[in-house]
Regions:
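ABC-type ATPase nucleotide-binding domains, specifically the catalytic core motifs of the NBD
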Residues: 88-107, 116
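ABC ATPase "signature
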Residues: 210-211, 219
Length: 237
């Protein structure tokens, strides 16, 4: 379980949030500038909170005298821009994050994750040749290949066309249901609520309301909250 209760002032933004994510998917929804990506940077360890506590599976990652480095937090991260290396092919990009493994094992491990995600055909493709959806699959494979205990995704579908967005949402939902990792997705798109077991709606650095998708649809705290809860989930085969 990923748990966080932190406060951080970032320029004009006062960021304060209290979240607990078990083996489920939490979608943090809100407009651009709400503080969603800043929240992810705090959880990852890229930005140090002013106060509070962050823990993962009972292990303290941040507290008054503890600040575990990002590379040791066992949190997978899929950035909005994918952060893939254009001079490497698909399997090399996935293997890049596996420096903790012996060199001879890295490609085999990366290839296994591409296979699991139905992306083995991308192993020897150059990044410039790939669509946004294909880049997203590689970024997800790279994050999961490190076998994290929690997964964070920053606007994972923002740069995709509507067709690719629907396909990737369905694929990611199936994968998250299979692995049962604590997963936190931030998004400004109300349609991404279909991925959620729970939704938290954020504005100006604060969580306004959080609960199950059914709870927020049934009793939203405001019209603003209601605008970020999608209609009934799409079903997938």
């Amino acid at each position: 379980m990923l748990e966080a209760r932190v406060v951080k002032r970032l320029g004009a933004l006062d960021l304060a949030f209290d979240l607990s994510v078990g083996p489920e998917t939490l979608v943090v929804a809100g407009p651009n500038g709400a503080g969603k990506s800043s929240m992810l940077r705090v959880l990852l360890g890229a930005v140090r909170p002013d106060s509070g506590r962050i823990s993962l599976d009972g292990r303290t990652l941040f507290a008054a005298r503890i600040d575990v480095p990002p590379e040791d937090r066992l949190i997978g991260y899929v950035p909005q821009d994918y952060a893939l290396f254009p001079h490497l092919d698909g399997i090399e990009n996935v293997a890049f994050g596996l420096a903790h493994l012996p060199r001879r094992e890295r490609r085999a491990h990366a290839g296994a994750w591409l296979e699991r995600l139905g992306a083995a055909h991308l192993a020897h493709r150059r990044i410039a040749e790939l669509s946004g959806g294909e880049c997203q699959r590689l970024a997800l494979a790279r994050a999961l290949a490190r076998e994290p205990r929690a997964l964070l995704l920053d606007e994972p579908f923002a740069s995709l066309d509507p067709s690719a967005r629907r396909e990737l949402r369905a694929s990611l939902r199936r994968s998250l249901q299979q692995w049962r990792l604590p997963a936190l997705i931030v998004s400004h798109d109300p349609d991404d609520a279909m991925l959620a077991d729970r939704i938290a709606v954020m504005e100006r650095g604060r969580i306004l309301q959080q609960g199950s998708t059914a709870e927020l649809r049934r009793a939203p705290a405001s019209a603003f909250v209601a605008s970020f809860t999608a209609p009934e989930r799409e079903t997938s085969s």
